[in-house]
Amino acid sequence: MAISKKAGAKKAGAVSKPPPSKGASSKGGVAKADWREGFKKAQAGVSDMTLLSKVTNEAINDNLQKRFQNAEIYTYIGNVLISVNPFRDLGIYTEDILQSYRGKNRLEMTPHVFAIAEGAYYNMNAYKENQCVIISGESGAGKTEAAKRIMQYIAAVSGGSNSGIQDVKDMVLATNPLLESFGCAKTLRNNNSSRHGKYLEIMFNAHGEPIGANITNYLLEKNRVVQQIHDERNFHIFYQFTKAATATHRENYGIQGPEAYAYTANSQCLDVNGIDDHADFRETISAMNTIGLTADEQDNIFRMIAAILWIGNVQYVENQEGNAEISDPGVPDFVAYLLEVDAGNVTKALTQRIMETQRGGRRGSVYEVPLNPTQAAAARDALAKAIYNNMFDWIVERINQSMNPRTQSSNVIGVLDIYGFEIFDNNSFEQLCINYVNEKLQQIFIELTLKKEQEEYAYEQIQWTPIKYFNNKIVCDLIEEKRPPGIFSALNDACATAHADPTAADNSFIQRTGMLSSNPHFDSRGTKFLIKHYAGDVMYNVQGMTDKNKDSLLKDILDLVDSSTNSYLQKLFPDRPDPNSKKRPPTAGDRIKASANALVENLMRAQPSYIRTIKPNQNKSPTEYDSQAILHQIKYLGLQENIRVRRAGFAYRNTFEKMVERFYLLSPNTSYAGEYTWQGDARSGCERILTDTGIAREEWQMGVTKAFIKNPETLFALETMRDRYWHNMAMRIQRAYRNYLRYKEECARRIQRMWKNNKEGLQYIQLRDYGHQVLAGRKERRRFSLLGLRRFMGDYLDVGGANGKGGGSAEGQMLRQATGMAAGEAVAFSSRAQLLVSRLGRSSVRSPRFLILTDKAVYILVTQLVNKQVSTTCERRINLGAISAVGLSNLRDDWLVLNVNNAEEADPILHCYFKTELVTHLLQRTNGAINVIVSNSLEYSKKKGKKAQITFRKDETVQKDDVYKSSAVSVCSGEPANSVSRPAPKKKPGLVRPITQGKLLRAGGPSNANNKPKPRAIPRSTPTPAKLPGSGAAGTARPAAAVGSASAGAGVGATRSAPRPPPPPPAAVAPSEPQVARYKALYVFATENAGEMALDKDDVVEVTQKDETGSGWWLVKKNGVEGWAPSNYLELIVQAAPKPKAAPAPPVKRAAPVAPSATTASQRPAVAAKPAFGGAAAGVVQPKPVVKTTPAGGKPHERAAAVQADAAAAPVSVMPGLGAPGGFAAVLAKKKAENAAAAAAAGAGANGKGAGAPPAVAAKPVVAPKPAGSNGRAMPPPPPRR
């Protein structure tokens, strides 16, 4: 069932806001705060009985009593409203209170009938589903009042400014006083008891505006027209008309006071406290005018009322023959005047009965049979009841005609106001019909709130605890079933078999009820029978039941009506049964059964809201609370079971399709800019929406076809988010546009500042933070490890060079050569370290080593003096797959142990200042396969099969570093284990400060990391030629003339017919054509790799692009085909300057630049000193990281090969549009790239001196790896594994 909506938002189509209070200030219309607001009325009991700590009937009764005594008559059970009749005006239906419930969900306000109306109206608009409000309870519990308040609220909030819609609203409200006057009466239990049932359907257009209405009438208690018990009254209209009729009506229709008529005076109750018949009559006339009844129609209605009153005054006496005789002949004469018939016909119809005999289907003799006084009184009353009943039906039909919608309706809201359950001392056919309809309504409540709900949970496979309840279907079947025959069927059979004699028919019915004795809810007791209804046991009197069930007029009465000249009276009796028809006319029981089933069908097609009314006492006292009577009502209304189902169940459910359609805006995975983007099925989309909105998993369940939400608060939150979506989108657009206009210059400055400050080391910081995660707070830290400027630079010895695969500094190249690693092996980490070396018979000592980590192995290099020469050799190579664990102590020392599987040698014990960084790179290269052990005692293999331990202890006497002695390391206390790196020191702020406080832009670039742009490719345009190093200032070679340019120009000129223009004057010198640099291959370069250019010795090629990052590869062009070739295989062909075209003097050849000698150490580009612990080396340069991309065929989750220094690499792009080739970043990087390019050109020149004989194979230059990507840069490194 649909539940109402979001919190706080007003609805579209709102008429207007309520006017400000009297205390509103003149400034902006804001009401002044009132101290009284802090003293709110104390709440009695709980407003929602699902919150009761103990769910029993007695606890429910106690809670209702507390609230009733505190003038709080409304209480919730979930979305069901419980209303206790206060029998007084509490002042809670004013316009201000009505407006306070507008646009609010039921949890925001105290319980009220207006909240139910608001929920129904909102759900109709939001979900485009028909709604109905079912009001049930016993007579006098306040059902009619609740229905009036529902209509009052809907008319007030439903919007619509044109006159047609306002007319519909006025007519809907006018139906209440009009139908109350004709359909309600004062009873012992209720001063305004509905003696009929009505179902009002208000029809709305697509905008939620009322465009029409329709009323369905159910079973008017017409017997009340002629008979009432003591201290009850006839229908209100009789007292209103007799007391307040105009002089014209009194004169024309002979109207006197109510005491003058038998039908109004016999019960001896002419006046009622709290009822003003004069005022009510004026309201009735106003309602007639609003509905659109003409003056003639109103006169005819009052004429029929007067006729009924005068018919009641026809009194009988018994003549000598024992037949009925009218005591006052003037009365039937006046009745004849009012009905516009012959007076003799009236007398005959009221004292005689015409009987016809038939033989073989033919008409026989006609007899006039006189009636005795009892029979005559029955005929008189039958005429009065028929006129009033048909007139009431005509009024309802006339109302529907006036409210008939002029356009097509989209949805309806139905309000059911029907007579309550009745138990009297003498219960007859009317009570049977009324209680039957109430049983049907109770069955609907059970079907929708108890039975159907539990069946739906089972079908949808929802976790659920079954609740026991009483299903009254067995009682409904007892009354309405045909097979086995129920009470209505037994009545029909009795009427058919003994139709002439009512007493014989009643006896036949008593005999037939014996067949129902097997039903446990039925008990036959002579001339009476008992039915155990859901609301209690009722004893019914059989006498007169069959006659009331036939509900047929005598032929004499119908003939009298037919003879009338009043057209209105003719309209009241449109259909006359065909006497020749063999089909049995429908009985009253048939009609009420058909009406009840049609009502149930209509209600089942709508989404119901429930109002359960309770009568607090039988005396209509505003202060009396009859606990026993209310406890009985609580039980038969099933409030306890309703609370249990509500507490255990789900407040809202809907199909996946409708759920997605309603709430897809709330998830970025299912919508974009208001468009539905989900590609999966509706179930997965629904689940995604509920997950993305942050709803706790226990708050919802997914069924087979529907999604279930447990609490209404969750649904209200969803509705609130949905209502705010478009509002937030509009605000975001407005805010973004204002920010663009107001802060675009500041944004540019912030981007520049951020880029300058962070371009160098963002990735190094990320790697450093991952190192903290690796230690996981298990090891004390050194103070220098936590410095804000500390970065994990990786290749401190520059073994990997610019791309991590060679070409670094001289020392780095020497170390790489010493390891013997393959050309494509990328270096991730290199540093100086110390290895613990054991000595025979003495304690082990630390010995200096070089430590290199690649994507394949760990290399330990040692420098020794061999034959009086310093030699660096690879002491040990350990494959990464062989390392099982890395051991670290929990103190601040710098020792680590590499545990190697199945090694013949001892596990290396290393002392390295960058131990955390080394472990971090190890984990990245092995995808976290290496176990990191942190302990104060580390185990290692001293040799194969022999284990040893090295222990660590604190010693505050050790002032610096740590001390090793006899398998024990002593070290002082360090920083706490949970320490993290300190923030980098802030630079001194510039003179220009932003005008904002830093809230406009978020630090660190875009908020969504997924939106980070990919590096752009460098366009393949010919770069500016790099300067060549020489002994002095570097000179720039003049470009040679393009091959074939002259002939091409001649060819073009030859095709023209115009004469050649005259030559230029001799003094002018024409500019030379641009030359293309040509290079000659010094060696054979054989390759089959895609994108590479195979070269033979002495091949001449053109260089179209030189990689400025120093990777050693150039893009060359040979015979129109481009490809990559190593730059150290090429030599520049120096060409003489071409002869100027217009110069008369012979050309002057420019001498080729002097070939440089072999590059000496002084001529090499300066290499920054390697960082040493403690700052021993000065001028530490922080290089930029270049990470190797995943090779073809590699594992997709394999970590990047290395993060090493590269002074020539382009900056890493951290903001959109920066760091691209040719941009600001390229200008910054150009200076750093010049040295690498110059070194490559110098090497080519040196090789040119002896090109006649290629060097030995061993002397052939090593081919550098190709640039990664078209711009020579690799993709950014993946985030560290967490």
Curated annotation (Swiss-Prot):
<feature type="region of interest" description="Disordered">
    <location>
        <begin position="973"/>
        <end position="1073"/>
    </location>
</feature>
<dbReference type="GO" id="GO:0051285">
    <property type="term" value="C:cell cortex of cell tip"/>
</dbReference>
<dbReference type="InterPro" id="IPR027417">
    <property type="entry name" value="P-loop_NTPase"/>
</dbReference>
<feature type="domain" description="TH1">
    <location>
        <begin position="781"/>
        <end position="977"/>
    </location>
</feature>
<keyword id="KW-0728">SH3 domain</keyword>
<feature type="region of interest" description="Actin-binding">
    <location>
        <begin position="412"/>
        <end position="494"/>
    </location>
</feature>
<dbReference type="GO" id="GO:0006897">
    <property type="term" value="P:endocytosis"/>
</dbReference>
<dbReference type="Pfam" id="PF14604">
    <property type="entry name" value="SH3_9"/>
</dbReference>
<dbReference type="GO" id="GO:0051286">
    <property type="term" value="C:cell tip"/>
</dbReference>
<dbReference type="GO" id="GO:0000147">
    <property type="term" value="P:actin cortical patch assembly"/>
</dbReference>
<keyword id="KW-0009">Actin-binding</keyword>
<dbReference type="Pfam" id="PF06017">
    <property type="entry name" value="Myosin_TH1"/>
</dbReference>
<feature type="compositionally biased region" description="Low complexity">
    <location>
        <begin position="1252"/>
        <end position="1269"/>
    </location>
</feature>
<dbReference type="InterPro" id="IPR036961">
    <property type="entry name" value="Kinesin_motor_dom_sf"/>
</dbReference>
<feature type="domain" description="IQ 1">
    <location>
        <begin position="727"/>
        <end position="747"/>
    </location>
</feature>
<keyword id="KW-0505">Motor protein</keyword>
<dbReference type="GO" id="GO:0030479">
    <property type="term" value="C:actin cortical patch"/>
</dbReference>
<keyword id="KW-0518">Myosin</keyword>
<feature type="region of interest" description="Disordered">
    <location>
        <begin position="1"/>
        <end position="30"/>
    </location>
</feature>
<dbReference type="GO" id="GO:0005524">
    <property type="term" value="F:ATP binding"/>
</dbReference>
<dbReference type="GO" id="GO:0051666">
    <property type="term" value="P:actin cortical patch localization"/>
</dbReference>
<keyword id="KW-0206">Cytoskeleton</keyword>
<feature type="region of interest" description="Disordered">
    <location>
        <begin position="569"/>
        <end position="590"/>
    </location>
</feature>
<dbReference type="GO" id="GO:0007015">
    <property type="term" value="P:actin filament organization"/>
</dbReference>
<dbReference type="InterPro" id="IPR001609">
    <property type="entry name" value="Myosin_head_motor_dom-like"/>
</dbReference>
<dbReference type="GO" id="GO:0044853">
    <property type="term" value="C:plasma membrane raft"/>
</dbReference>
<feature type="region of interest" description="Disordered">
    <location>
        <begin position="1237"/>
        <end position="1282"/>
    </location>
</feature>
<dbReference type="GO" id="GO:0031097">
    <property type="term" value="C:medial cortex"/>
</dbReference>
<dbReference type="GO" id="GO:0005902">
    <property type="term" value="C:microvillus"/>
</dbReference>
<feature type="compositionally biased region" description="Pro residues">
    <location>
        <begin position="1059"/>
        <end position="1068"/>
    </location>
</feature>
<keyword id="KW-0677">Repeat</keyword>
<dbReference type="InterPro" id="IPR001452">
    <property type="entry name" value="SH3_domain"/>
</dbReference>
<dbReference type="GO" id="GO:0051015">
    <property type="term" value="F:actin filament binding"/>
</dbReference>
<dbReference type="GO" id="GO:0015629">
    <property type="term" value="C:actin cytoskeleton"/>
</dbReference>
<feature type="domain" description="SH3">
    <location>
        <begin position="1074"/>
        <end position="1135"/>
    </location>
</feature>
<dbReference type="GO" id="GO:0005737">
    <property type="term" value="C:cytoplasm"/>
</dbReference>
<comment type="function">
    <text>Type-I myosin implicated in the organization of the actin cytoskeleton. Required for proper actin cytoskeleton polarization. At the cell cortex, assembles in patch-like structures together with proteins from the actin-polymerizing machinery and promotes actin assembly. Functions as actin nucleation-promoting factor (NPF) for the Arp2/3 complex.</text>
</comment>
<feature type="domain" description="Myosin motor">
    <location>
        <begin position="44"/>
        <end position="723"/>
    </location>
</feature>
<dbReference type="InterPro" id="IPR010926">
    <property type="entry name" value="Myosin_TH1"/>
</dbReference>
<keyword id="KW-0597">Phosphoprotein</keyword>
<feature type="modified residue" description="Phosphoserine">
    <location>
        <position position="365"/>
    </location>
</feature>
<keyword id="KW-0378">Hydrolase</keyword>
